[in-house]
Amino acid sequence: MKASQFFISTLKEAPADAEIVSHKLMMRAGMIKKLGAGIYNYMPIGLRVIRKVENIVREEMNRAGAVELSMPVIQPAELWQETGRWDKMGPELLRLKDRHERDFAVQPTSEEVVTDIARSEIRSYKQLPVNFYQIQTKFRDERRPRFGIMRGREFTMKDAYSFDRDTDGLRKSYENMYDAYVRIFRRFGLEFRAVAADNGAIGGSGSHEFHVIAETGEDAIVYCPTSAYAANMEAAEALPLVAERAAPTQDLVKTFTPEKVKCEQVAEFLNIPLETNVKSIVLATDSDAGPQIWLLLIRADHELNEVKASKVPGLAEFRFATENEIVEAFGSPPGYLGPIDMKKPVKVVADRTVANMSDFVCGANYRDYHYTGVNWGRDLPEPIVADLRNVVAGDASPDGQGTLEICRGIEVGHVFMLGTRYSESMNATFLDENGKTQPMQMGCYGIGITRILGAAIEQNFDERGIIWPAAIAPFAVVICPVGYDRSEAVKAEADRIHAELLAAGVDVILDDRGERPGVMFADWELIGVPHRVVVGDRGLKEGKVEYQGRRDAQATAVSVAEVVGHVRSLLAN
C-alpha cells in the first residue's frame, strides 16, 4: 500500500479533553475522531488495528472449537424481562421504543438472546456441548464517559457463550476458554495477568478477569510474587492480621474526645496508633417489616470492600443508612458510633482483623466520647465475623506462599461460569440420556476488542508516540523515501523494496506523500509502526538504506541487497 492511497491525519497537539495517554495518542495519530460523548469514529489507521485484534481473537476462538454467529444489536425487552435484567441493569441499559410502542434494549451483552437461541435449537444431550461467539457492537449508557475508548459508550466486544450438559462439562468449557484467552493475549504481545474475580451483575459461580498491566489502570490487581495467587481487589481474600486474639490488658473507659469525629483525629488526640482504632460503617437493608440496621466494623487504617460486604448473609441488597436512621439506632450522630450501648437492635459484623483485636478504641454512641480498652466477650457480645476489607500490600497471601503485592491493571477480558442462572429463568433445557429434562450449564466469555487498543498503548508508548506490539500494529513496516518525487534512484529503490515485501506477504506501506523527512518520521513514530526503512540518495551512493526499529535509539545501515531479508528475519522473530 502507498500512503497516497491511504488516509493519514495526524495532530501535533492532543485535544484539550483527552485525559490519558492512550486517548491523547489515538487522537493525535488519527486513529479515532470523537463524534459524541463516549462515541467515536474509527479512522482507517484505528480500524486496521481493530481488524488485527479481531483476526487473532477469531483464530483462537475457532481453534478452541467455538462457532461464530451474529446477534442483533437491538433486542426485544421481553427476553430481558424473563431474566429480570431489564430492571436490574439500571440506566446503563439503553432502552428505546419502536413506532408500535414496543420496548427494546441496545445490547451491552447477549446472554438473553443466545439463551433464546439455545432453547429454540437444542433439544438433546447429543447436541452438547456447543460454544457460540460473536464480534459485535455493544452499547452501555455510561453516566460519565471518559478516557477515550477505555470507558466509551459504544464499543466492539467479542462475547462467547458455552452450553453444557453438567457442571463437569461447564468446567471443561471454562478451562478451554481460559486457555484460549491466555493464547490470545500472548499473541497480542502484551504483559497481562489473569486474576480471580467477582461475578458481579452477570451472576454465576466463578470468574477470572484478564488485565493488561499498566500504571494508569483503573483496577488494583493483587498478586503474590512467589506463587500463582492473583485476584482483583474485589475478590482478594484478606486474612486476619493476627492468628489469635490477645488477652485484655486494659479496662473499658469512656473517654472524652471533644469534636474528634475521625479515627485519625481520635488517634492523634489520644496519642495512640491509628491501627488500634475501629471505625463504624452503618448499612441498612429494607423489607416489609421495615429497615434492618447493620454495623460493620473495620480497622481504622483499612477500607471497606463493598462487594465483600454484599456477600454477608442478609446484606446482598444493602444501602448506606441515612443520618436519621443512624441517630435513631445509635442515639448519636456519625463520628461517635460503636457497638456498645446501641438504642435499637443492630446486627454487628466485624472484619476478621477486628474480630481478633483486643483493647481497641471505638465510638461510645455519645457525642464527644469514645471507648478505650474495648474487648470482645467482656464488654460486648462476639460479633458476626466476615472478610470485609480490601487487602493491602504486605498482607499474607491466602495460599500461604508469601505476601501480597498490588499493581494497576486495565480489564480487557472476563470469563464467567454462569451455571443455570439464565437457562433456568428462560427455560433452556435439554433431554439427557435418560429422557429427563435438565437445564443447560452456561458459561460466558468476553473480550473488549476496542479496549485492547487503549490498553496496548497505555503499556507501550514513549515521548514520540505509540509503540505497537508487532502482531497488532496497523502496518508492520513503513518505507520512508527521502525525495521520492525528486530522485529517480530513490523512487526506484523504494518501489523495489515495497514490491518485494508485498510479494513476501509483509504488511507494508510506502510513504509517497512527498513530506519533509522530519514530518514523515514524526508521523510514523507517532502512529507506532514497528519497523522503518529510510531510502535516500546519500545512502544509495554507498549501496545502503537505513533500518530502525520503533524501540531503537539509532538507525543502522543495511545494504540494499539485504534489506528485504533483514526485515523479514526481524518479522519472523
From Swiss-Prot:
For this UniProt record, the keywords arranged alphabetically read as follows:
Aminoacyl-tRNA synthetase, ATP-binding, Cytoplasm, Ligase, Nucleotide-binding, Protein biosynthesis
Q: What CDD domains is this protein classified in?
A: ProRS-INS (cd04334), ProRS_anticodon_short (cd00861), ProRS_core_prok (cd00779)
A Gene Ontology biological process term: prolyl-tRNA aminoacylation
Q: Which reaction does it catalyse?
A: tRNA(Pro) + L-proline + ATP = L-prolyl-tRNA(Pro) + AMP + diphosphate
Q: Does the keyword Nucleotide-binding apply?
A: yes
Q: What is its main location?
A: cytoplasm
UniProt GO molecular function: aminoacyl-tRNA deacylase activity; ATP binding; proline-tRNA ligase activity
Q: Which domain of life is it from?
A: Bacteria
Instruction: State the EC number(s).
Output: 6.1.1.15
What Pfam families does the annotation carry?
HGTP_anticodon (PF03129), tRNA-synt_2b (PF00587), tRNA_edit (PF04073)
Q: Which InterPro entries match?
A: aa-tRNA-synt_IIb (IPR002314), aa-tRNA-synth_II (IPR006195), aa-tRNA-synth_II/BPL/LPL (IPR045864), Anticodon-bd (IPR004154), Anticodon-bd_dom_sf (IPR036621), Pro-tRNA-ligase_IIa (IPR002316), Pro-tRNA-synth_IIa_bac-type (IPR004500), Pro-tRNA-Synthase_IIa_type1 (IPR023717)
- What's any one GO cellular component for it? cytosol
Q: How does it assemble?
A: Homodimer.
- Give the record's family classification: Belongs to the class-II aminoacyl-tRNA synthetase family. ProS type 1 subfamily.
Q: Record's domain comment? A: Consists of three domains: the N-terminal catalytic domain, the editing domain and the C-terminal anticodon-binding domain.
Q: What does this protein do?
A: Catalyzes the attachment of proline to tRNA(Pro) in a two-step reaction: proline is first activated by ATP to form Pro-AMP and then transferred to the acceptor end of tRNA(Pro). As ProRS can inadvertently accommodate and process non-cognate amino acids such as alanine and cysteine, to avoid such errors it has two additional distinct editing activities against alanine. One activity is designated as 'pretransfer' editing and involves the tRNA(Pro)-independent hydrolysis of activated Ala-AMP.
Under PANTHER family, the record lists: MITOCHONDRIAL RIBOSOME PROTEIN L39/PROLYL-TRNA LIGASE FAMILY MEMBER (PTHR42753), PROLINE--TRNA LIGASE (PTHR42753:SF2)
Tell me what this protein is called. Answer: Proline--tRNA ligase
Query: Which species does this protein come from?
Result: Cupriavidus taiwanensis (strain DSM 17343 / BCRC 17206 / CCUG 44338 / CIP 107171 / LMG 19424 / R1)
Give the source lineage, highest ranks first.
Answer: Bacteria, Pseudomonadati, Pseudomonadota, Betaproteobacteria, Burkholderiales
